Design a protein with these regions (language model features):
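Alpha-helical transmembrane segments of multi-pass small-molecule/ion transporters
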Residues: 1-237
């Protein structure tokens, strides 16, 4: 039952408008702690929904299909928006604007869109393989736990490799906590009824933090990757 729900648009607008707003502020802010915090905020907002959100949603008796639908929406939105916005904030010295947009798009597409396309291809063309893979569905919680462990490792690595100093770290902690709590809260408010409230909260709040760390480290101020590592911790508390 993969289809659009009423809360999808509201949740997506929170991510997109928040990202564009803070990206605009970052673009007109000079380098320093303030710009780092703005960059942390914008990537914590636009980061797509985590695949693990479906596992948590199912455990909480939410709507798994609605979470998967929102996962696809956020991946598509991030795939188109990020390559357009990042070059305005951190232009490449060796490439023009559109060439840099294309480079980022080619990096983002395999990470966010290709797995979804592969899943759809398997679902509609190779039913035997799909049935075999579906046998692992009851073990999805354990796969999520492994993913959580890896996210914690990435968080620790990001912190040690990009330690920003005490005050800057305190600011990044505050931003990551605030964006995490706000998105879970807004998601629950946007979703109407118990099931939609749970589902929208998980869809908007649970992030693909591995992608968040990768994005910050490679295309923004590298220390912003620490926000992704910290977000991985807060979203699972």
């Amino acid at each position: 039952d993969i289809r659009l729900r009423g809360w999808h648009l509201g949740a997506l607008l929170v991510q997109v408008l928040g990202f564009v707003l803070f990206a605009g502020l970052a673009a007109i802010t000079s380098d320093g702690a303030g710009r780092i915090l703005l960059e942390c905020t914008m990537i914590c907002l636009i980061c797509p929904c985590a695949a693990a959100a479906g596992v948590i949603t199912r455990k909480l008796d939410g709507d798994l299909a609605a979470t998967v639908s929102y996962l696809c929406l956020t991946n598509l939105a991030a795939t188109f928006l990020i390559p357009m916005v990042i070059p305005m904030i951190r232009p490449a010295s060796d490439l023009g604007f559109w060439a840099y947009v294309l480079r980022i798009a080619l990096k983002v597409f395999p990470v966010l869109v290709l797995p979804g396309l592969l899943a759809w291809l398997i679902r509609y063309t190779t039913h035997k393989l799909q049935r075999r893979l579906m046998r692992f569905a009851p073990n999805s919680f354990y796969i999520w736990f492994i993913g959580l462990t890896l996210a914690m490792v990435l968080a620790t690595h990001a912190l040690f490799m990009n330690y920003p100093g005490g005050w800057a770290l305190a600011g990044i902690v505050a931003v990551s906590v605030a964006t995490c709590a706000l998105q879970f809260f807004l998601g629950r408010r946007i979703g109407k009824g118990r099931v939609n409230s749970i589902t929208a909260g998980q869809g908007l709040g649970q992030k693909n933090t591995g992608f968040l760390i990768w994005l910050g480290y490679n295309y923004l101020t590298p220390v912003t990757s620490v926000a992704g590592g910290l977000y991985a911790i807060w979203q699972n508390l």
